[in-house]
Amino acid sequence: MSIRYESVENLLTLIKDKKIKPSDVVKDIYDAIEETDPTIKSFLALDKENAIKKAQELDELQAKDQMDGKLFGIPMGIKDNIITNGLETTCASKMLEGFVPIYESTVMEKLHKENAVLIGKLNMDEFAMGGSTETSYFKKTVNPFDHKAVPGGSSGGSAAAVAAGLVPLSLGSDTGGSIRQPAAYCGVVGMKPTYGRVSRFGLVAFASSLDQIGPLTRNVKDNAIVLEAISGADVNDSTSAPVDDVDFTSEIGKDIKGLKVALPKEYLGEGVADDVKEAVQNAVETLKSLGAVVEEVSLPNTKFGIPSYYVIASSEASSNLSRFDGIRYGYHSKEAHSLEELYKMSRSEGFGKEVKRRIFLGTFALSSGYYDAYYKKSQKVRTLIKNDFDKVFENYDVVVGPTAPTTAFNLGEEIDDPLTMYANDLLTTPVNLAGLPGISVPCGQSNGRPIGLQFIGKPFDEKTLYRVAYQYETQYNLHDVYEKL
């Protein structure tokens, strides 16, 4: 197996045993990007000069047996809404084209401390609004499994780069499914941690009560290793939780005999494609064969997840994105002749169609006369959705179901039909609304396109999610498929 398809765990061992140098790994990764990314289009910016310099410094430390850091010498790709000091961060928007941050996000500080090597920034839906990475101002990423298909979104670049062997790990952000859905479409592992598990300091805000940063990898153990590196409370983020237990790997190989798994009937109901249902039902049989107890339950408010999510997320976005005014930073219209024109023209020229649609929707939902009917009501529905989960978790350890109702759709197929696009979030948005952890792992393929299985856990119980996902992965995975793509 070439270096580009090696797991994080194997690379760490090879580096520790001095069988390869960090600079060899980084060189191989850039060669892979040069060869493959003109087709996949997952990267927006590369940090080649700094990456090679850092790798050479790590070579010297390796020679002295000073290999500190959980991710020593491991290459990483970062979604372009995560601030990287000195490297352009655009959120895939014309609004932030050319914006180079002068500070570091907390997750990047942590990853640098663990001696991971930043390869570059990954494509995404503009300001993380979209489910196909087609709303990016710069390019449309394709699915490595089928170049006619979307990679999912909004972290499409993060999922595609990992599946294509361009980085062994990437970070994405998940507001309503933006890590798990592209992970499902691209056949990789994607974790949305519990809200507050990972600091959001330096994540460009979309919807502050929903956003969460998480890792994408080609296997479950790698994913747990990365989450260990980025988790933890942060004084710069008042919503980060003071939870000390960040050991996700020690029990990962433990069996799941007697583990109680809930299968909500709503997750295999209307809107879920037959091929997805079949793959999930097969996965349920696999879990039973591993000793888990799977029982059907009901999460009756699932169907209200999408409407309440789109009201809440758009409302928060309309507030968060008001800072892009054409004056302090970001795109500045050259045609304006007054201050009012400058505000209007900078925003209407700098934001894309989908971002403007959501700002309109959010501003409307927050306006006087409509606030109670939309925003307040959506928050009440959010509580009902959370209560549904709380009730189920009184008797069960994890919830299982599909990640997305279908496999990846074709490029251009849904971009002009926002309601159809939003419907893809049916099974992921409730997890964000309730602030729970959720992981997507591959569980099948249909016409060559991957199908994702989602496990949802109790707050801050990522450990159990990794355990069950790891056991399932021993029975079904795509580890031999990536290299053939």
Curated annotation (Swiss-Prot):
Q: What does this protein do?
A: Allows the formation of correctly charged Gln-tRNA(Gln) through the transamidation of misacylated Glu-tRNA(Gln) in organisms which lack glutaminyl-tRNA synthetase. The reaction takes place in the presence of glutamine and ATP through an activated gamma-phospho-Glu-tRNA(Gln).
Catalytic activity annotated for this protein? L-glutamyl-tRNA(Gln) + L-glutamine + ATP + H2O = L-glutaminyl-tRNA(Gln) + L-glutamate + ADP + phosphate + H(+)
Residue ranges that the Swiss-Prot or TrEMBL entry lists as coiled coil: none
Q: How does it assemble?
A: Heterotrimer of A, B and C subunits.
Gene (name only): gatA
Q: List the disulfide bonds.
A: none
Q: Which InterPro entries match?
A: Amidase, Amidase_CS, Amidase_dom, AS_sf, GatA
- GO MF annotations for this entry? ATP binding; glutaminyl-tRNA synthase (glutamine-hydrolyzing) activity
**What is the protein name given in its UniProt record?**
Glutamyl-tRNA(Gln) amidotransferase subunit A
Q: Which organism is it from?
A: Staphylococcus aureus (strain Mu50 / ATCC 700699)
GO CC aspect terms: glutamyl-tRNA(Gln) amidotransferase complex
The family database entries (Gene3D superfamilies) matched by this protein are listed as: Amidase signature (AS) domain (3.90.1300.10)
For this protein's source organism, the top of the classification is:
Bacteria, Bacillati, Bacillota, Bacilli, Bacillales
Any keyword Membrane? Answer: no
Q: Which UniProt keywords apply?
A: ATP-binding, Ligase, Nucleotide-binding, Protein biosynthesis
> Which positions are catalytic residues?
K79 (charge relay system), S154 (charge relay system), S178 (acyl-ester intermediate)
